[in-house]
């Protein structure tokens, strides 16, 4: 490990205190390592060009999701440090950073690959493509009105739905909106995709878990309806008038760097199942 890229959520480090500490810790552990700090805006192309051995993202889950979407095609491993609220996706908490860097330079780490989704559709004369580590959500925005749509899997009709929307989730995203909507927790290493309708009508319209190779098509949406998608909880994208929305596994996988003593079930239990207060971070 000779070259390390770093991005710190500037909202969490307005005076640069964390940045100074991070550089100090890394240099104390290994003097000849090159540490490159990247600003918030438009840094991803530069990261892909410089190709650091791994990339450290300091922030909450949003920071990690953003890094994953933008760095996945470069194959650069991401080591995530929580300085946000919950930080379920983080490899470590900020207080453990010094010990973590020591372990990394001793080789006490492994790489974990996570499935990502590709969402695409044609609107007007242009094709829109989005990447997701957590989920793609189709919904009606702020309208309290039911949404009607059809789901095809691998060009075979699955079901027509009446619901408030639908969540198409990766295993990584299964503990996010999917779980809140009644979907299952899926172990993050598995190559699966889950479909969870939001408040559906019908005798059974629960989650279906599909093979990761499945191609999902959403169609049959009224062209006059105001309908949106969100990808990993980002700004909504208007899909009014779109005939088909296609969702499938991305050809690349997100590569995460984890310490050898990382315990997924401990993090799951504390931060998702029990939601203990010490994992809550700052109060709302």
Swiss-Prot record:
Q: What GO terms fall under cellular component here? A: cytoplasm
**Catalytic residues identified in the record:** 61 (proton acceptor)
**What's a single GO BP term from this record?**
NADP biosynthetic process
User: Could you say which residues bind NAD(+) here?
Assistant: 61-62, 134-135, 145, 162, 164, 175-180
**Per UniProt, which keywords does this protein have?**
ATP-binding, Cytoplasm, Kinase, NAD, NADP, Nucleotide-binding, Transferase
Annotated InterPro entries? ATP-NAD_kinase_N (IPR017438), ATP-NAD_kinase_PpnK-typ_C (IPR017437), NAD/diacylglycerol_kinase_sf (IPR016064), NADK (IPR002504)
Per the UniProt record, which EC number(s) apply here? 2.7.1.23
Entry annotated with the keyword Transcription regulation:
no
Q: Which cofactor names does the annotation list?
A: a divalent metal cation
Which Gene Ontology MF annotations are present? ATP binding; metal ion binding; NAD binding; NAD+ kinase activity
Location in the cell: Cytoplasm
Query: Catalytic activity annotated for this protein?
Result: NAD(+) + ATP = ADP + NADP(+) + H(+)
State the superkingdom: Bacteria
Q: What is its main location?
A: cytoplasm
Which SUPFAM superfamilies does UniProt cross-reference here? Answer: NAD kinase/diacylglycerol kinase-like (SSF111331)
Keyword flag Kinase = yes
**Per its database record, what is this protein's job?**
Involved in the regulation of the intracellular balance of NAD and NADP, and is a key enzyme in the biosynthesis of NADP. Catalyzes specifically the phosphorylation on 2'-hydroxyl of the adenosine moiety of NAD to yield NADP.
Homology family: Belongs to the NAD kinase family.
Q: What protein does this entry describe?
A: NAD kinase
Source organism per entry reads: Clostridium acetobutylicum (strain ATCC 824 / DSM 792 / JCM 1419 / IAM 19013 / LMG 5710 / NBRC 13948 / NRRL B-527 / VKM B-1787 / 2291 / W)
